Amino acid sequence: DAGIVAVNTVDVETYVRYVLPSEMPSTFDAEALKAQAVCARTFVYSQMKNTQYALYGANIDNTTAFQVYNASEAKQSTDEAVKATAGQVVSCGGSLITCYYFSTSAGKTEDMEVWSSSTPDFIHKVESVDDNSPYYRWTSELDLSAYNDPQYGTATGISVDKTSDAGYVLSLTINYGNKSQVFTAENDIRKALGHYQKKVTLNDGSVRENMSMIPSAC
């Protein structure tokens, strides 16, 4: 309703140049960096028709809701990956694919079911053990009273209604006596649980605090 919105206008290659080291460690192998650059470029091109920020003349934001964009110092390794793949995107049947990616899997990759969408033919589940990652498993304690809502009333419980083969939550319900809120979209589930969450203990024992959403819906 009030305030200032800053909009940063950059060309796609400059955008990818800063997204790449923001989304993947610059120490990763060259081929991994190249693959990530192609994914990042494909993703941003596919968002060009996104109207979420049309009011501001923008297509995307700089968070995990789209892709993390930290306009900090670029790295030589990621710069080389961007240059080596300049202009390259992934398409299927003449159309850009929706190029989702993640930092850590729960033991296997997922299909589009986690976004309540049908799965294209080019996506297949594969084993992807990632148990050496700090984010492979995590724990957190939530205060149920934090979910009391003026519209719904006093929160009486949170239940997981459906999970995928890999363990991702596909449906989550917050109960309020005779009322309930049901969340089925991956980001909505992460935000619903993460909104009042103060501390997360990761797989390696390290602690993350004041996160805007939980690390995953798994």
Residue ranges, per PLM feature:
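Conserved, single-site charged/polar hotspot
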Residues: D1-C218
